[in-house]
């Protein structure tokens, strides 16, 4: 016990030393690190994307610039962001895209130079929107194409509509998804319909609120995995190794405040209806373990070991652990499983698992 007490006291002294007694060389190194830190921009397209940007801005997102783009001037006025861009001023006159993705696309092309200027110095660009409407569905692929052309690692985090929103909206979403696939390194898809499997019989208003929460947590969790100092830090090169050409990706989110909180949180994430794929064939995984001040390294390792045991031995796994003071006694796990496109097919009613055809097996 005395040994442990001494270790804790020495650790406390070391923290004080790190904060108070930096040499000129150390300060120079810190300044250099700040200058060379990966520049990350989050772009919210359309109504759902703007809502996400506003929430991220209000809650605080560490180490990222926020940009909101829209064809609707009124929505943009209500949005909080570091940079706002009203796209397609000549085309829509600030009145919106009327649910037409083609108008959203043309509006983004009209404002391409302004979009490019807003993300020009970015090493990584996150694009977020709710697919199915006009502005987000139409503009997000244009933003992604611009991002790729400037050499940024380009990741989109998007939602698919609820089935109750109608076939036209779902058809728009699937077409937008196909265009996004062409211009993104990794495309993270959140099928809203699957939320009903998590919370059955949700009222309509609550369903949309839950969808927004999932989108916000996914974007924030991904960004802060890179930008936020934590127990285990992940650098940009690590993330790039998983997300560069990561293809289609799915997420799983779980949390628990029980005695076995880490075990239960990762189990929930792996069994999340949102992660509706066979992950054994995935090419990579990003794992973000979040928890309060008493989050232990052993808990983080337990999460990673559990996920690793389910993946192909050749899959690239990157993980990090950060402290979130808002998570009182709760461990939250965010999984992003990449390279799952071979298991998924796109239909006008959403994403479906492909039926695997078994060959060489005699019929009985």
Swiss-Prot record:
GO terms for biological process, alphabetical: cell division; FtsZ-dependent cytokinesis; protein polymerization
Annotated compartments: Cytoplasm
Alphabetical UniProt keywords: Cell cycle, Cell division, Cytoplasm, GTP-binding, Nucleotide-binding, Septation
Chief place where the protein resides: cytoplasm
Function: Essential cell division protein that forms a contractile ring structure (Z ring) at the future cell division site. The regulation of the ring assembly controls the timing and the location of cell division. One of the functions of the FtsZ ring is to recruit other cell division proteins to the septum to produce a new cell wall between the dividing cells. Binds GTP and shows GTPase activity.
Family: Belongs to the FtsZ family.
NCBIfam families xrefs: ftsZ (TIGR00065)
Full protein name: Cell division protein FtsZ 1
Chain's gene name: ftsZ1
């Amino acid at each position: 016990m005395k040994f442990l007490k001494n270790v804790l006291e020495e650790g406390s002294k070391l923290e004080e030393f790190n904060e108070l007694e930096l040499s000129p060389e150390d300060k120079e190194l810190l300044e250099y690190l700040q200058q060379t830190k990966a520049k990350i921009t989050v772009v919210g397209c359309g109504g759902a994307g703007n809502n996400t940007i506003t929430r991220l801005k209000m809650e605080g997102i560490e180490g990222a610039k926020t940009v909101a783009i829209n064809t609707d001037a009124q929505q943009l006025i209500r949005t909080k962001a570091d940079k706002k861009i009203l796209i397609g001023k000549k085309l829509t006159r600030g009145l919106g895209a009327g649910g037409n993705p083609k108008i959203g696309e043309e509006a983004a092309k009209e404002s391409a130079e302004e979009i490019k200027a807003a993300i020009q110095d970015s090493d990584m660009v996150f694009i977020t929107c709710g697919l199915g409407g006009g502005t987000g569905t139409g503009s997000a692929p244009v933003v992604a194409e611009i991002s790729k052309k400037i050499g940024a690692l380009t990741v989109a985090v998007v939602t698919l509509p609820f089935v109750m929103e109608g076939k036209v909206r779902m058809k728009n979403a699937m077409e937008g998804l196909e265009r996004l696939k062409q211009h993104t390194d990794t495309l993270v898809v959140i099928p809203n319909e699957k939320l009903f499997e998590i919370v059955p019989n949700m009222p309509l208003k609550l369903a949309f609120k839950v969808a927004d929460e999932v989108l916000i947590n996914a974007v924030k969790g991904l960004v802060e995995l890179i930008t936020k100092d934590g127990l285990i830090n992940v650098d940009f090169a690590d993330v790039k190794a998983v997300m560069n050409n990561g293809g289609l990706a799915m997420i799983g989110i779980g949390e628990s405040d029980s005695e076995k909180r880490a075990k239960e949180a990762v189990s929930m994430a792996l069994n999340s209806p949102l992660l509706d794929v066979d992950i054994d064939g995935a090419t990579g995984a990003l794992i973000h373990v979040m928890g309060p001040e008493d989050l232990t390294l052993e808990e983080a390792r337990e999460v990673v070991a559990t996920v690793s045991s389910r993946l192909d031995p050749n899959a690239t796994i990157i993980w990090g652990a950060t402290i979130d003071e808002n998570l009182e006694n709760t461990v939250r796990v965010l999984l992003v499983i990449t390279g799952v496109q071979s298991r998924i097919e796109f239909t006008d009613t959403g994403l479906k698992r492909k039926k695997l055809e078994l060959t060489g097996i005699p019929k009985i």
